[in-house]
Design a protein with these regions (language model features):
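His/Asp/Glu-rich mid-to-C-terminal helical/loop segments that flank catalytic regions of hydrolases
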Residues: 1-17, 46-49, 94-101, 109, ...
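Midchain, well-structured core segments that form catalytic/ion-binding scaffolds
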Residues: 1-148
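Short glycine/threonine-rich loop-to-helix capping motif typified by GTGT followed
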Residues: 31-39, 87, 91, 184-197, ...
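Zn-dependent metallopeptidase/amidohydrolase metal-coordination segment
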Residues: 112, 119-138, 147, 198-263
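Short, flexible active-site loops
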Residues: 140-150, 174-181
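C-terminal, non-catalytic macromolecule-binding modules
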Residues: 145-169
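Short, contiguous acidic/charged loop-to-helix segments that flank catalytic cores in large enzymes
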Residues: 149-154, 182-186, 246-247
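Generic long, charged, amphipathic alpha-helical segments
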Residues: 167-202
Length: 266
């Protein structure tokens, strides 16, 4: 579950039905990690306090039901804080809520020939409210960061255009940076064939060759050297790009042995 997406579902209803006003919002920590936490400071009329408290409880039950068996530790809470000194202008607040609600998150397209493999996706990764100097004035800036990936460059550009439209309609400035080019795998590669044979000779079993949906340096190298054959391999990593990320130590030694064997084979 994306904590930012869940939070904005609650915010949209609180603003629409209970006259809530948004003061600030924070969520996510890394662009390549699905946000696990998000929070917002809102103001509400005194007579809406019980209604908003009930709203939060209802949404927590709803989210637990929607993600049953997937997000067992999901929590949604509300607590009183000091009254904020200022609120986000109402029109900006409304545009922001609509844009984040509309912004795609998750799988956008799968590989047609391999429908269990993701081709194109977007991660609505971070949102923050920051005070910055603009033309010698302190202003509050709301920043939203996404990470779009695809093994097909044109599909990535299509999805980026969708995201740009959503936030441009909300009056936001949209920029793109740090793009990873797509890397389309070549399962008929001679390099892959050689290293599969090497692995079998080294360990007496067949390697598991899979396509993964991730940003790899191979995409950047392949853009500059389109005829270069490449594969990516390494030790077993569990829960990547999360606070629970860890490596299987036993596979590091195996990985090292395979690197030596691969260099000899080449």
């Amino acid at each position: 579950a994306n904590a930012i997406k869940l939070l904005f579902r609650v915010l949209k209803e609180a603003v629409t039905n209970y006259e809530a006003r948004l003061a600030c919002v924070e969520g996510g920590s890394l662009r390549n990690a699905i946000p696990r936490e998000a929070s917002a400071v809102i103001t509400i009329p005194k007579d809406s306090y019980d209604d908003v408290t009930d709203l939060v409880a209802r949404f927590e039950d709803l989210f637990l039901a929607e993600y049953e068996g997937v997000e067992t530790d999901l929590r949604l809470t509300a607590e009183e804080v000091d009254c904020p000194q200022q609120e986000i202008p109402e029109d900006v607040q409304d545009f922001l809520i609509h844009a984040v609600t509309l912004c795609p998150h998750g799988v956008y397209r799968v590989i047609p020939e391999q429908p269990d493999i993701v081709e194109t996706s977007n991660n609505l990764a971070m949102i923050s409210t920051n005070e910055k100097m603009v033309n010698d004035k302190k202003v509050n800036i709301i920043e939203v960061c996404c990470l779009t990936r695809s093994s097909v460059e044109s599909r990535k550009e299509e999805l980026q255009s969708v995201i740009q439209s959503a936030f441009s309609l909300a009056g936001a400035d949209v920029t793109f940076s740090g793009s990873y080019p797509g890397w389309k795998p070549n399962l008929k590669s001679q390099l892959l064939h050689t290293l599969k044979e090497t692995y079998h000779q080294q360990f007496g079993s067949e390697p598991r060759v899979v396509i993964i949906h991730a940003g790899l340096e191979c995409g950047i190298i392949g853009r500059n050297y389109p005829n270069m054959e490449m594969i990516s391999f390494g030790p077993t990593i569990e829960h990547p790009h999360s606070p629970d990320e860890r490596v299987n130590i036993a596979t590091v030694q195996k990985f090292y042995q395979f690197v030596l064997a691969a260099l000899k084979a080449l």
